[in-house]
């Protein structure tokens, strides 16, 4: 494919050092492009976060692309082979922070819209974009706030494509049609500090927690299902003691996380953890944080359309998967009937020398255009 508009727009976005939540006028650039083809733009800013809701049309179905203009910090700049905010073509790849996650996806959807509208100026339904500068950070003032606004006025989405990088080995090989929930615990096991030579005068929280830890790590939380792997429990941090070799610690801090399927619930997991701790007589304080519930789009029209567009452009059959971390899809699903995630390779996201394959860029734009054509122009699946 010789289409170069997507590459040029991706470069323009990457050149803006939009480290979360600083948008650096990325959204302004998108508005300038989309205004020319009939999109109305609504700024929905909260605190330091910039959000934009763009829409062309007033009818249904509404096909929405969701993305984020913010990027994670670069890490040590000297370790990059080229400056992270100077998009560089090298060895058949485009390098730069945000190349994969997710400025290329945004660029590809914008150019797909430009071509689609040129060919179908009176298309069915509406096209929308929900863009935030707060996905890589706390994600408190970004997509979730925009969803609240849209929900309050009854503005719903029929089909949503989140441009997260999803490809594993080649473009189009994987579509995310759901995500696991994420539930974290911050556990403080209480003991009594003392001299290590006099254990009878102390209570060692490491020892009292050990049997419960064994049971927690061996527990089968659920078996998963057709779309989700079994729920996983992982310890991320354990810390206790003063650093001295002759002091029994007074407290033990344990941080853990569940990635849970639709076979489990937040309340159910909490209850089971408390039951195990209580069973072993652990004295503790436990604080919980749930950053996202599991969600799923059953195989249906949107997944079929996306697979057809991928097959047409990439010549492969896409796999449906719910693996990986959380995304803003967890917020959007509250107002979206069907939602998928589809973007470039995730092999280098958040890494030094983040990149995408140059020949994947026009293909991804063509895939997005193919989805629009099938949903809003009556093209056969």
UniProtKB/Swiss-Prot annotation:
> What is written in the cofactor note of this entry?
Binds 2 Zn(2+) or Co(2+) ions per subunit.
Needs which cofactor? Zn(2+); Co(2+)
Q: Name one GO biological process term.
A: diaminopimelate biosynthetic process
Record's function text: Catalyzes the hydrolysis of N-succinyl-L,L-diaminopimelic acid (SDAP), forming succinate and LL-2,6-diaminopimelate (DAP), an intermediate involved in the bacterial biosynthesis of lysine and meso-diaminopimelic acid, an essential component of bacterial cell walls.
PANTHER family given in the database record: ACETYLORNITHINE DEACETYLASE, N-ACETYL-L-CITRULLINE DEACETYLASE
Say yes or no: keyword Glycoprotein present. no
Subunit record text:
Homodimer.
Q: Where is the active site?
A: 70, 135 (proton acceptor)
Return the broad EC class.
hydrolase
Q: What are the protein's GO molecular function terms?
A: acetylornithine deacetylase activity; cobalt ion binding; succinyl-diaminopimelate desuccinylase activity; zinc ion binding
Protein name as annotated: Succinyl-diaminopimelate desuccinylase
Going by the UniProt record, its keywords in alphabetical order are: Amino-acid biosynthesis, Cobalt, Diaminopimelate biosynthesis, Hydrolase, Lysine biosynthesis, Metal-binding, Zinc
Amino-acid positions noted as binding Zn(2+) 2 in the UniProt annotation, renumbered to this chain: 101, 136, 350
Positions with a binding annotation for Zn(2+) 1: 68, 101, 164
Tell me the protein family, please. Belongs to the peptidase M20A family. DapE subfamily.
Q: Which InterPro entries does the annotation name?
A: Bact_exopeptidase_dim_dom, DapE_proteobac, Peptidase_M20, Peptidase_M20_dimer, Peptidase_M20A
* EC number per UniProt: 3.5.1.18
**Metabolic or biological pathway, per its Swiss-Prot or TrEMBL entry:** Amino-acid biosynthesis; L-lysine biosynthesis via DAP pathway; LL-2,6-diaminopimelate from (S)-tetrahydrodipicolinate (succinylase route): step 3/3
Q: Which organism is it from?
A: Neisseria meningitidis serogroup C (strain 053442)
Report which reactions are catalysed by this protein: N-succinyl-(2S,6S)-2,6-diaminopimelate + H2O = (2S,6S)-2,6-diaminopimelate + succinate
